[in-house]
Amino acid sequence: MDIRAAEISAILKDQIKNFGKEAEVSEVGQVLSVGDGIARVYGLDNIQAGEMVEFENGTRGMALNLETDNVGIVIFGADREIKEGQTVKRTRAIVDAPVGKGLLGRVVDALGNPIDGKGPIQGAERKRVDVKAPGIIPRKSVHEPMATGLKAIDALIPIGRGQRELIIGDRQTGKTAIALDTILNQKPLNVAGAPESQKLYCVYVAVGQKRSTVAQFVKVLEEQGALEYSIVVAATASDPAPMQYLAPFTGCTMGEYFRDNAMHAVIIYDDLSKQAVAYRQMSLLLRRPPGREAYPGDVFYLHSRLLERAAKLNDSQGNGSLTALPVIETQANDVSAYIPTNVISITDGQIFLETDLFFQGIRPAVNVGLSVSRVGSSAQTKAMKKVAGKIKGELAQYREMAAFAQFGSDLDASTQRLLNRGSRLTELLKQPQFSPLKMEEQVVVIWAGTNGYLDPLPLGKVRAFEDGLLSLLRGQHADILNTIRDTRDLSDETAGKLKSIVEGYAKTFA
């Protein structure tokens, strides 16, 4: 091997020329103890609350407890590689996440890193995950409908863009199914070329769920063509508690990007009970004093600061909105437990799902008596308002009468008629999964129910009547559906046309 002196001198000259005097100064601390996803670190005197830190092996963490002699850090990842005595480096950045349209169609973890194997996220900017909610002045009252495609909800418990509506019920009562149907129902709004004021982007945050469940959820979204306008944030049961705590905030930041840029989004937190459990675990390990049910004293603030970020902004702010659908799981229908009462008091209404109704075959298993939307009919179109007012009253009377009817069999004709109508309307509100209905189709079906066209039918034929009527209208009378959709009203003229069609159909159906 021959050594060329000229070559060596050229390399040396180049290195001397590019020699920089800058030295990187980073504040470091030392790990005192580590375990259960918590590290105690000495020496980070100037660290900020909520700041991201980096351990020697590249694992990240967040400073939560700032004490006199040490800092309590929650670790976003496995703590097996972290040892006592290792150095911890400040990043000088509060925890943030990527936001933007580049996230649509992707599955990410609680820090915004892609976990779907589709490569890095393109063109995303970064925003802090825990920011202040909009104040009173930038907001506007909720007035646009956020359709779920479910008759029982859109007619009786309407949700508006910018509202927070809680979905609450025991396990296996169809809470996630309602959320999934809501996402699928936005497909017609998100067609290519539609105006941004019409589109509704969806963010689904899975907290503490099985990986198989999340994979199945994503598969359904993909098959139904709904993933392209959705973002999935997953912190599964096998992820550390800090990730489960952070995921809802990360998802909310992604949703806020749409809200603040004159667009609309809906975010589903599935579910916040598991986030509260993860937060309780972290707090107890950080030796914060426990309160009721061993939750820390600020668990109410945990959920209120998250849900207050859902808002309908006014014209000067761009008219954007972020709608929140938090999910809470109860134990044996106990809605008076700590976390359920907290979230009920924060939200603008709740949808109660009951196990008994679910097993009776009433699905979605919504208890329309206990469920409420505090925004009410201001989040409905005129057409839906006209037909929904009647169905609410009739179902309320039916529930009252059904309780009395159990005691005696000799009922007068009017009571019998009321019970008959109520049972048909209850049957009408049933709906299979993955089959959301458009607003105009719901209006027509409910109009037929409240005007007595279902009364002569046996209960088992109600579904067939509804399906047949809708296929007739879609095929031969699409103009009626289009009129209701475009005017958002059910005029006397349209109602007259509808009456003759439904009467004709009822004769042939019988």
Swiss-Prot record:
<keyword id="KW-0139">CF(1)</keyword>
<dbReference type="InterPro" id="IPR000793">
    <property type="entry name" value="ATP_synth_asu_C"/>
</dbReference>
<keyword id="KW-0472">Membrane</keyword>
<dbReference type="GO" id="GO:0043531">
    <property type="term" value="F:ADP binding"/>
</dbReference>
<comment type="subunit">
    <text>F-type ATPases have 2 components, CF(1) - the catalytic core - and CF(0) - the membrane proton channel. CF(1) has five subunits: alpha(3), beta(3), gamma(1), delta(1), epsilon(1). CF(0) has three main subunits: a(1), b(2) and c(9-12). The alpha and beta chains form an alternating ring which encloses part of the gamma chain. CF(1) is attached to CF(0) by a central stalk formed by the gamma and epsilon chains, while a peripheral stalk is formed by the delta and b chains.</text>
</comment>
<keyword id="KW-1003">Cell membrane</keyword>
<dbReference type="GO" id="GO:0045259">
    <property type="term" value="C:proton-transporting ATP synthase complex"/>
</dbReference>
<keyword id="KW-0547">Nucleotide-binding</keyword>
<dbReference type="InterPro" id="IPR038376">
    <property type="entry name" value="ATP_synth_asu_C_sf"/>
</dbReference>
<dbReference type="GO" id="GO:0046933">
    <property type="term" value="F:proton-transporting ATP synthase activity, rotational mechanism"/>
</dbReference>
<protein>
    <recommendedName>
        <fullName>ATP synthase subunit alpha</fullName>
        <ecNumber>7.1.2.2</ecNumber>
    </recommendedName>
</protein>
<dbReference type="InterPro" id="IPR033732">
    <property type="entry name" value="ATP_synth_F1_a_nt-bd_dom"/>
</dbReference>
<dbReference type="Pfam" id="PF00306">
    <property type="entry name" value="ATP-synt_ab_C"/>
</dbReference>
<keyword id="KW-0066">ATP synthesis</keyword>
<keyword id="KW-0375">Hydrogen ion transport</keyword>
<keyword id="KW-0406">Ion transport</keyword>
<keyword id="KW-0813">Transport</keyword>
<dbReference type="GO" id="GO:0005524">
    <property type="term" value="F:ATP binding"/>
</dbReference>
<keyword id="KW-0067">ATP-binding</keyword>
<dbReference type="GO" id="GO:0005886">
    <property type="term" value="C:plasma membrane"/>
</dbReference>
<comment type="function">
    <text>Produces ATP from ADP in the presence of a proton gradient across the membrane. The alpha chain is a regulatory subunit.</text>
</comment>
<dbReference type="InterPro" id="IPR005294">
    <property type="entry name" value="ATP_synth_F1_asu"/>
</dbReference>
<dbReference type="InterPro" id="IPR000194">
    <property type="entry name" value="ATPase_F1/V1/A1_a/bsu_nucl-bd"/>
</dbReference>
<dbReference type="Pfam" id="PF00006">
    <property type="entry name" value="ATP-synt_ab"/>
</dbReference>
<dbReference type="InterPro" id="IPR027417">
    <property type="entry name" value="P-loop_NTPase"/>
</dbReference>
<dbReference type="InterPro" id="IPR023366">
    <property type="entry name" value="ATP_synth_asu-like_sf"/>
</dbReference>
<feature type="binding site">
    <location>
        <begin position="169"/>
        <end position="176"/>
    </location>
    <ligand>
        <name>ATP</name>
    </ligand>
</feature>
<dbReference type="InterPro" id="IPR036121">
    <property type="entry name" value="ATPase_F1/V1/A1_a/bsu_N_sf"/>
</dbReference>
<feature type="site" description="Required for activity">
    <location>
        <position position="371"/>
    </location>
</feature>
<keyword id="KW-0997">Cell inner membrane</keyword>
<dbReference type="InterPro" id="IPR020003">
    <property type="entry name" value="ATPase_a/bsu_AS"/>
</dbReference>
<keyword id="KW-1278">Translocase</keyword>
<dbReference type="Pfam" id="PF02874">
    <property type="entry name" value="ATP-synt_ab_N"/>
</dbReference>
<dbReference type="InterPro" id="IPR004100">
    <property type="entry name" value="ATPase_F1/V1/A1_a/bsu_N"/>
</dbReference>
<comment type="similarity">
    <text>Belongs to the ATPase alpha/beta chains family.</text>
</comment>
